Amino acid sequence: KGAAHSLARLFDVAADPANRALMTFPSPKTGATVWRCYQVPKTVDDLALRRLMSARWAEETFGLMGRTPDHVAGFLAGYAAKPSVFAEHGKEFARNVLAYHEFARDHHLYLSYAIVPPQIDRSKPAHRQSDPTLYAGVVKETDAGIVLKGAQQLATGAAFCDAVFISCIHPMQPGDEAY
């Protein structure tokens, strides 16, 4: 209950017209007002405003609430700032990163992430586990998207967010491509 009220306060701060210049910016695609945490900084001023926006939300919770909506949004903004990293494995990966950043930004998504595999046998990479579906991984690709099977944890904020971004904090090894 307390976390839900704290998040509601953050959304209220972002929606308050008095905070518009700090907390939001116009979507490059639609011109609609969107959260600044999704902005890809192009200037020193953009970066400074992004920091001030995060500081404003941190002040609202006295710095005690982890994984506020700006956290994973910042990851997506970082990915969108450098899509060439994703293009190294295929142009479609860069396009997908940019499209998802745009979608999340323009729909004000509060995202959480799940980034740590279950605590099983950490001496083995994902593809060498006794059951290939212990770690979250792609088991099927369709025109509509991917089908995942398995688990991933450390999804702080998942109970409140719009979607969970599945990723992995551990370095991947050859053979782990599905994970």
Please report, for each region that a protein language model flagged, where it lies by residue.
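Generic recognition of long tandem-repeat/solenoid scaffolds
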Residues: I146-K149
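Internal helix-loop-helix
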Residues: A15-L111
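Short, surface-exposed, low-complexity cationic segments
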Residues: G2-D16, A159-I169
